Amino acid sequence: MADKRDYYEVLGISKSASDDEIKKAYRKLAKQYHPDANPGDQTAEAKFKEASEAYAVLSDPEKKRQFDQFGHAAFEQGGGGAGGFDFNMGDMGDIFGDIFGDIFGGGRRSRASNGPMNGANLRTAIRITFEEAVFGCEKELELSLKDECETCHGSGAKPGSSAETCHKCNGKGQVTFTQQSLFGMVRNVQTCPDCRGTGKIIKEKCPDCYGSGYISRKKKIQVSVPAGIDNGQSIRIRGKGEPGTNGGERGDLLVEVNVSRHPIFQRQDYDIYSTAPMTFTQAALGGDVRISTVDGDVLYEVKPGTQTDTKVRLRGKGVPTLRNKDVRGDHYVTLVVQVPTKLNNEQKDLLKKFEESVSGKKSEDTTTEDTKEKKKKFFGK
């Protein structure tokens, strides 16, 4: 027997690969090398057979156990199929149906499509302010939604006429067809192309809805935005999506919330972050600093000698949680000392006197000595 590659190597997987990983690897190779997708390519056909043989073994728990223990020698006495053993193609029907459906455009086997089907969800977006996201709000949307046509009452047929049973699928909404493959005939089921799964054909269409059974109308919808919602989250409004078919329920409306940036506040989860200014005097002597919060301004008492970039925590001044609006996050504030940019002569003298009292030196003398020293270094004297 000619040398054969390890089955795991053929599929490009490890020995610890799960059943899903084995199936996924085979699916990829089968789609790539299937003879019908590569007509006349003998190399592709050989690789397809090799991958199919590997999958037939590794997808069967008993054969996989034998291969893991004895390798290819476990099947040398099997005779028959490619590679010295006979594998059951019936066990591979599901994956073949999936693969051939992808390659040839056929659908996967599915439940009858002419039963009740819920409508699709609709998506839209709203923009709200930072404060509206924190405390919640009410918004009104105007959307174009489909409603049952009043002329035909949703049948899609012209008044006085009725829909007929589809002859192609006999009212089932699905058609079955077979395809010849390398391994025999493969059975596929797909939605009927004539009636699109409804099982009925409308020959005389309603003049108002043109056979769809629905009319689009502008509607106003109230959106209750809960307190604590964050940017990018969505609100689900049930029953405001696309109408269902064959008695199915309407889909839902998903409203994505976009929160505008705030000039002062930033948010992380349920906590708020900001900065607040304090004067040099407040930092040195202590006192009340005014801090802006989403609830309004509050006074925070700083201790004498508070340094710039000091962080303080205002408990319960953050964002309400979605589960319980009475529970709120915190507000973290970074205190920043504001240095005055314009001083009059009197203010400058006072600061100089303060500096002298701290350093023990006259500010003018210190400046003069510094200036002299710099000049000496510059002129080399």
UniProtKB/Swiss-Prot annotation:
This protein's UniProt keywords: Chaperone, Cytoplasm, DNA replication, Metal-binding, Repeat, Stress response, Zinc, Zinc-finger
Binding annotation for Zn(2+) 1: C149, C152, C206, C209
Cofactor descriptive note: Binds 2 Zn(2+) ions per monomer.
Cofactor(s) this protein cannot do without: Zn(2+)
J domain: residues covered: 6-71
Biological processes, Gene Ontology terms: chaperone cofactor-dependent protein refolding; DNA replication; protein refolding; response to heat
CXXCXGXG motif repeats: 149-156, 166-173, 192-199, 206-213
Entry GO MF terms: ATP binding; heat shock protein binding; unfolded protein binding; zinc ion binding
Disordered: annotated segments: 356-381
InterPro entries (alphabetical): DnaJ, DnaJ_C, DnaJ_domain, DnaJ_domain_CS, HSP40/DnaJ_pept-bd, HSP_DnaJ_Cys-rich_dom, HSP_DnaJ_Cys-rich_dom_sf, J_dom_sf
Start-end of CR-type zinc fingers: 136-218
Compositional bias (Basic and acidic residues): 356-373
Subunit relationships: Homodimer.
Sequence similarity: Belongs to the DnaJ family.
Protein's name according to its UniProt entry: Chaperone protein DnaJ
Annotated source species: Lachnoclostridium phytofermentans (strain ATCC 700394 / DSM 18823 / ISDg) (Clostridium phytofermentans)
Origin organism lineage: Bacteria, Bacillati, Bacillota, Clostridia, Lachnospirales
